[in-house]
Amino acid sequence: MGEEGFLAHFAFSIGGLPITQSVLTTWFIMISLFIMAWSTTYKCSLLQPSTYQLLWEGVLSTMYDAIKEVLPDHVELIFPFVATLWIFILVSNLIGVIPGFYSPTADLSVTASLAMMTFLSVHWFGIRAEGWREYLKHYIKPTPFLLPFHLISEISRTLALAVRLFGNIMSLQLTALIVLMIAGFLVPIPILILHIIEAIIQAYIFGMLALIYIAGGIQAHELKSQGESL
């Protein structure tokens, strides 16, 4: 979380296209998570699981149970997306603790991309549950005059997802930087603990909101089907 790593936003450019430090860190996180996932599944064992395997199984089981509480009938479908969001955002939030690294989630373009992925996934799961004709019809029910309000709601909650995560992580890093500049390294442990706690909370909130939005589209279809069958 050093000053050089935090302020060196633009790393280099390729053909005039700027490659920022958040892009480099995002690539590093994705490659690292891929290697970790591959190494865990490659050496996994049912009879003699390693400590590393048990750790990952515990993390994934916790996320699986959390999703199951919200969408018990669709957990297998939703789990890969929401679990990936949780893990990626958590690592992205925490990596800023390491000197020389920049938290990608302190970059609005990264959080906007994550929010857009969530926006698209909500509609994809909704269309998968209802079919695209029925799904699009709910925007004009009970009256077509509600269409603008539905669209504003979809856009505003997507923007809120992006800005909330960006604002919290950016303010956290700025606060930590200011405190370290004033007090030096006399208070590194409280700042580190604050960063870790906030990183976990923000990753959890983002993933839960994405899960709730997805559940809203799927469960609306299920409630409609139950009402028609009565």
From Swiss-Prot:
Top-rank lineage group of the source organism: Bacteria
Main location: membrane
Keyword Nucleotidyltransferase: no
Transmembrane segments: 17-37, 78-98, 107-127, 165-187, 198-218
The keyword Membrane belongs to this UniProt entry's keyword annotation: yes
Location within or outside the cell: Cell inner membrane
NCBIfam families: ATP_synt_6_or_A, PRK13420.1
Biological role: Key component of the proton channel; it plays a direct role in the translocation of protons across the membrane.
Family listed: Belongs to the ATPase A chain family.
Protein name: ATP synthase subunit a
Organism from which the protein derives: Legionella pneumophila (strain Corby)
